[in-house]
Amino acid sequence: MHPSAGVNNNQHLNHQPYQQMSHYNAQQMHQQQLHHQLMTPNPYQQHFQQQMHPQLHHEDHLNMHFNPMSYPQQQQQQQQQQQQQQQHLHHFGHQIPAPPAQQGPTPQQPHLHQQIPHPLSHHQTPQPTPQPLAQQQSPQPARQPRQTKKQKQQAQNQDQADAQSQAQQHHMAMMARANQNDMLESSTRKVAPRSSDLFRVGPPFSISKQHQPVYCVGTDMPVTPLLHARIDRGFEMGETGSWIGYKRNYFTLVASFTLQDFDFEKFIGNKFYTYDKVNNKVNGFPPHHPSHPQNQPQNHPGHPHHNQHAGESRVPISYFAIRLVAKCSDEDVAISLIQHTAKRDKGPQFPPPIYPAVPSELPDHETVKVSCNKRNNNKIETMNKIFYFDRGNYYQEYNLDSYKDQSILKSYPSQSISKVARFERIQFTSSIRVKSTNTTARYFTLHVELLGIIEDEDLQIQPILLSSIESPPLIVRGRSPSSYHKDRTSGYRATNTPTPTPPQ
């Protein structure tokens, strides 16, 4: 064999691995280009992915193109590949030099990343340069596993936090709308006129104050009348303990009277009288009239009333009546009451009536509450037995002749006599002006008066004030409850104005 032939054969043998390696690299480059063209998203997809997931590497977007939910797993796989790559590079370092780019599990894998920019330039999509890529993926090997675990945990926590934040924001938005609707509803909500929520027991009244004495005709013994009254609607206690009402609101008051040591049977079996020193018409009787002062028994020295009522006129009481009046603490201010009809329209308005009444106990608050606005005839009849005395039924029950009756019952003007005076749908004609400078001590009071109805010489009825009770000071406001931020009541509705936060 020729020596040169041996040399050529040796050269052929020496170059054969390099030719095979170049052929293998060419195939790998061709497959990588095809693989990159298939796996690389178009510019619109890359832009969308970068906007949605800016924290991902550009290679992660390739995986996101086909499997959007696998980018956390891909990061873990990349870290495993980096560890394997370092081992292979250490083993084959004397054969194949390692490029600065990211290495794969085989020595030929670095050529993939070297050839990636060429197909990407075909799409004209901007990609990060290899230098930042190498900087991003060349941390210290000792800290690499902890960063990978931390990044994975941060990605998972970020997704959970984003989902929870969106759900919480949606829930808070719904709660805000619901609270706003509740505030608007509460600020505009009105209680129905017949609603039981309007009824609440008002302030207590004082003890009875007697203005004129009352005597029994048969014994000339003094009789002590006792008044009872209660406000069942329209007033409530404010935050400072004052009793507050509103001019536009109705209030309801019930009143009755009793005679001490006199039951009802004893009452209707007697007559009563009093003395009058004010009514000039009564004192103007002619000398022959029984009511003239010289014909009065109390003017005789032996009469038990001589020392107290000498010179006064003794007048018989035809019947008793109950009246409701309002007064102001300022005597120069006139205040009155009006009563509305049950139709709640701008119909006729009258002053509260004077109720002829017989002695009776005051019903409780629940009875008054139930008795309002009844429409059932049976229930109305039941309530009438509580609030009224029927004189005609009484005569029939005891077989009495109304013409021969000499009791006080005969003097009452009608068959139906009130046992309890019900003052319903009552309003004040004026209110207390809060902005006035002299209103600090101004207030209103309600007075329930027991009247003795007498007749003068012209047979005209005249009232004589026998006894009275009064309420504690009442504040009557002219505007809605929400207009008064101090001393609030239950009708107060807070405005939407936010309260300033105190400085820290």
Swiss-Prot record:
Keywords: DNA-binding, Nucleus, Transcription, Transcription regulation. Its main location: nucleus. Disruption phenotype: Abolishes the induction of CDR1 expression in the presence of miconazole and increases susceptibilities to antifungal agents. Severely reduces conventional biofilm formation but increases pheromone-stimulated biofilm formation. Compromises expression of SUN41 and CHT3 genes, leading to a defect in cell separation and growth as chains of cells. Impairs virulence in a mouse model of systemic candidiasis. The keyword Nucleus applies. Pfam families: NDT80_PhoG. Residues 73-87, 103-145, 153-172, 292-301 have a biased composition (Low complexity). GO terms for cellular component: chromatin; nuclear chromosome; nucleus. It is found in: Nucleus. Residues 160-488 bind DNA. Residues 64-172, 283-310, 477-504 are annotated as: Disordered. One of its GO terms (molecular function) is DNA-binding transcription factor activity. The keyword Thylakoid does not apply. InterPro entries: Fungal_trans_regulator (IPR052605), NDT80_DNA-bd_dom (IPR024061), NDT80_DNA-bd_dom_sf (IPR037141), p53-like_TF_DNA-bd_sf (IPR008967). Induction: Induced during biofilm formation. One of its GO terms (biological process) is positive regulation of transcription by RNA polymerase II. Meiosis-specific transcription factor that binds to the middle sporulation element (MSE) of targeted genes corresponding to the consensus sequence 5'-ACACAAA-3'. Acts as an activator of CDR1 induction by antifungal drugs. Modulates azole sensitivity by controlling the expression of ergosterol biosynthesis genes. Required for hyphal growth in response to different filament-inducing cues and for the proper expression of genes characterizing the filamentous transcriptional program including noteworthy genes encoding cell wall components, such as HWP1, ECE1, RBT4, and ALS3. This is Transcription factor NDT80. The gene is NDT80.
